[in-house]
């Protein structure tokens, strides 16, 4: 059985991070091996939450797993509470990332033009270093702009332009040029205005190809959708699917869950009821 290390936080509410990744990777027929970066009562979008930082415990996982002699077919990292955790992940990669290991980094920094509470310049610089090691990164547009030091407002002001996706593609190539491995960047949650209505799309860019897939935009955002997307992508690529196949699978899976959550008026911080759609990933 293939094995994926999941480096992310564990939140009691919000259906995100590890509570999203573990069921997705498991249902896709792989062993999910969680390495928690923090344990929270609820994800940080809630008005109140308690966070137990795991920075000083992360190395225990690395060292104990080394003693077991285990290997990983995939490594997926997400939320980091500070730059110190990024150094722990870099150490983990040194120990466990082999030539055949797929590493996916989700550079959790912000959304909708705003940075998250944990953001700092030190965290950003660390994330820039971390993403150079990844075969796949899955930023949203805000995170892509932060990583490329691009003004988000200037980019988003072009979303009615015909060349909007080309502008985003150009930013991706700026990052790819700095990567230490062959890299694919998948930009998530790109909202575009079309005559038939607003759509939300995901854009995959590599040196070899560009691929874009979209679905109707409900106008609402939900906790954990980026984590679910990254988890499906990671699982699909580790299983040997192509980038296009992985993108299609992740997009269609999320579309159903998001449309239902919108119909049911589920508060965004609680995430989507993805569990009933896990069979789509078999």
Question: Where do the language-model regions lie?
Answer:
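Conserved N-terminal subdomain of the carbohydrate kinase-like
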Residues: 1-105, 109-117, 275-280
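Phosphate-handling active-site elements
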Residues: 209-211, 236-250
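Conserved phosphate/ATP/ADP-binding segment of small-molecule kinases
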Residues: 117-210
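Short, small-residue alpha-helix embedded
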Residues: 145, 220-243
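Charged C-terminal helix
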Residues: 244-282
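Fold-independent oxyanion-binding glycine-rich loops
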Residues: 8-10, 37, 78-79, 106-108, ...
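Short pre-catalytic strand/loop immediately N-terminal to key active-site residues, enriched for Gly-Thr
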Residues: 12, 210-224
